[in-house]
Amino acid sequence: MTKVEYKHTHIAAKKKLGQNFLLDKNIPRKIVRESGIKEGDLVLEIGPGFGALSTAILEVMPSFTAIEKDPELARFIREEHPEINLIEGDFLKVPLEPLTGSGKLAVLGNIPYSITSPILFRLLDNRHLIESATLMMQHEVAQRITAVPGTKEYGILAVQMQAFCDVKYLFKVGRAVFKPRPEVDSAVIRLVPKAQNPVEDSEGFRTFVRRAFHQRRKTLWNNLKEYYNTSEVPAETLKLRAEALTVEGLIELFEKLTPIDHALNDPETRNGIE
């Protein structure tokens, strides 16, 4: 177990919480600049830890809200930054709507690698409450979110996030600026939910995407034939693999499909990212 010291406070990094503390001052300031937040915005930080990003946010605004699951770190933040409205709890469970007031949330965070997928889908499910999300995460996941068709990174996560959000890869962060030092690099991305949903049936689309990419080497026809009536889809399209279609192309395909009532059970868990 690695103990991290910061301002005479010793806290053991908890592996089960995926804790890797950012102790660099310049990177948090860059994250804040890239987020575009300004005084008066409704800011929510996910997992402030020792407050590296929190301190940078406070350089822009006098107060904001943060959610911290670790009781030791929550106590540290309360003592170190009493101006922060700290909620001690699990971001995956804390109701977000009461935090919005009359506006939308600008979310920032250095999110744990171990729960990146659940956090992303929680944000996606609550995108009507979100103005933007500027997040640091595992570099590989950031690449997959921002991937383009025809690449090995392009898959379920890219399509599901890009369908409902404008996504942008901002910059890479080396592993040496964290303690404990992770085995992989990180990256910062920005998500901005789209004003209009591209599809009426969001849940149906997510299920379709999982099925389309379930076995990447198979054609769309082979992956979808058990679940949908494809009579309205051109044969040329069904001969392709899912990775060949753009997000817009996959949305267009989904709109032409009719579910088969006796379709087999879904092959993937809802929040799986391949």
From Swiss-Prot:
**Where in the cell is the protein located?**
Cytoplasm
Quote the SMART domains the UniProt record gives: rADc (SM00650)
Which keywords does the record carry? Answer: Cytoplasm, Methyltransferase, RNA-binding, rRNA processing, S-adenosyl-L-methionine, Transferase
Q: What is its EC number?
A: 2.1.1.182
Q: Which Gene3D superfamilies match?
A: Ribosomal RNA adenine dimethylase-like, domain 2 (1.10.8.100), Vaccinia Virus protein VP39 (3.40.50.150)
GO molecular function annotation: 16S rRNA (adenine(1518)-N(6)/adenine(1519)-N(6))-dimethyltransferase activity; RNA binding
Q: Which reaction(s) are listed as its catalytic activity?
A: adenosine(1518)/adenosine(1519) in 16S rRNA + 4 S-adenosyl-L-methionine = N(6)-dimethyladenosine(1518)/N(6)-dimethyladenosine(1519) in 16S rRNA + 4 S-adenosyl-L-homocysteine + 4 H(+)
- Please tell me where this protein is predominantly located: cytoplasm
| InterPro entries according to UniProt | KsgA/Erm, rRNA_Ade_diMease-like_C, rRNA_Ade_Mease_Trfase_CS, rRNA_Ade_methylase_Trfase_N, rRNA_adenine_dimethylase, SAM-dependent_MTases_sf
Highest taxon of the lineage: Bacteria
Query: For S-adenosyl-L-methionine, which residues are the binding ones?
Result: 20, 22, 47, 68, 90, 110
Q: Which GO terms describe its cellular component?
A: cytosol
Q: Which residues form a coiled coil?
A: none
**Purpose:** Specifically dimethylates two adjacent adenosines (A1518 and A1519) in the loop of a conserved hairpin near the 3'-end of 16S rRNA in the 30S particle. May play a critical role in biogenesis of 30S subunits.
Which NCBIfam families does the protein's record reference? Answer: ksgA (TIGR00755)
Q: Which family does it belong to?
A: Belongs to the class I-like SAM-binding methyltransferase superfamily. rRNA adenine N(6)-methyltransferase family. RsmA subfamily.
What is the name of the protein in this document?
Ribosomal RNA small subunit methyltransferase A
Q: Which gene encodes it?
A: rsmA
